[in-house]
Amino acid sequence: MLETRWHLIRHAPVDNPEGRIYGSSDKSANTSNANAFQLLAQRLPREGIAITSHLKRTQQTLDALISGGLEVSQQIIENRLGEQDFGDWTGKTYEEVRSLFGDAYDKFWITPAKEKPPNGENFIQVIDRVRECILDCTKKFKGRDVICISHGGVIRAALTIALKIEAERALSISVDNLSTTIIDYLHPCENFAGTWRVRCTNVPAI
């Protein structure tokens, strides 16, 4: 049975001592922990297809993995795998958002998958673009290993697809920096319609 394997890795940590919402803003990753990248690189398949988002923290993470020994056959940048856009909340602390947006902030946390920050996007929209990208790439790279360095929201979105769960439930799944989540697509064959399988979630680099 032919499988396409997705190794979903959340980017390296972002230095953010004030706890500001950075979402789709282009923050740098802290890639100083060389040991973590070396250990993670050893566990990943060789000659896989590497896909990052357009945000530099994912590309910096891939560069650090390659420096740690990872070998990839191709590198692709995919805008559809960017983190959720929190609109007017971006760059603010949660306390600042609560003070400035009041009722809208409170309403957001009642149904966080469906509510949209002002001038941003909701998690449902993230799922839609991630689904489109994953299905396209699964077809294009059929039977290959895909090493996807992206974001917490993107990985949760991928799990809604693989597990067929509601968006709200996916938001309760932990996705730590440099953790690995592996999902496989088992391609259709005679008397088999094809399905997703989850191998593991949130496996730490160290």
Specify the residue positions occupied by each region the protein language model found.
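Generic beta-sheet signal
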Residues: 6, 48, 144-150
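Short beta-strand scaffold positions
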Residues: 52-53, 128, 149-150
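Active-site metal-binding loops of divalent metal-dependent hydrolases
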Residues: 12, 152, 203
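Acidic, low-complexity terminal tails and accessory targeting/binding regions
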Residues: 1-5, 84-99, 139-144, 160-206
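Conserved histidine-centered catalytic loops in small-molecule metabolism enzymes
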Residues: 2, 45-80, 184-206
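Active-site-proximal alpha-helix that buttresses catalytic centers in soluble enzyme cores
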Residues: 4-70
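Phosphate-handling substructures
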Residues: 28, 68-131
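Short, active-site-adjacent cap segments at secondary-structure transitions
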Residues: 15, 57-59, 83-84, 154-156
